[in-house]
Amino acid sequence: MKYRLSDISTIISGGTPKKKVKEYWNGSIPWITIKDFNAKKTNSFTNYISEKGLNNSSANLTKENDILISSRGTVGKLLMVKSGMAFNQSIYDIRTDTKKVNSDYLYYWLYKNIEEIKQKVHGSVFDTITRETFDLIEIALPDLSVQSEISSKIKVIDEKIEANQQINDNLVV
């Protein structure tokens, strides 16, 4: 069955606390920008915000297995979230409806189809993914059990690639 991406997920916008208010920054909540998208999964952050910064801005928190996508500037970078973090307004959080789609399956599908997705962006000066873009992205989904089976197989291969990359990185040093 075919679905629009917006029908199988909740699209959540990010935000930035006011930089001038010092008590909004250097807290315990990781705050991610596109610059922090250095791998498929990230555990390193350059900025942290406080609870007060989160509550007094349009920033939102991710949940485990959410998918982040860069929406401005460098459009289409993807990140699978493994823990809660806040994010800026140049990123959308795709929170899947787990009754319809497996998060890993959707992540791999987006990764494979990112060039096609980039063709749906808007903007006169800069390419931008907007909320409307998610209505234009259609995905044919197999049953959840098939999605899980496919994503499990890809994940094993992906983990081997990451392990080999780590070995290569260590050899360079």
Can you say where each PLM-predicted feature lies in the sequence?
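DNA target-recognition domains and sequence-specific DNA-contacting regions of bacterial/archaeal
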Residues: 2-139
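Non-catalytic DNA-recognition/assembly elements of restriction-modification systems
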Residues: 1-15, 39, 136-173
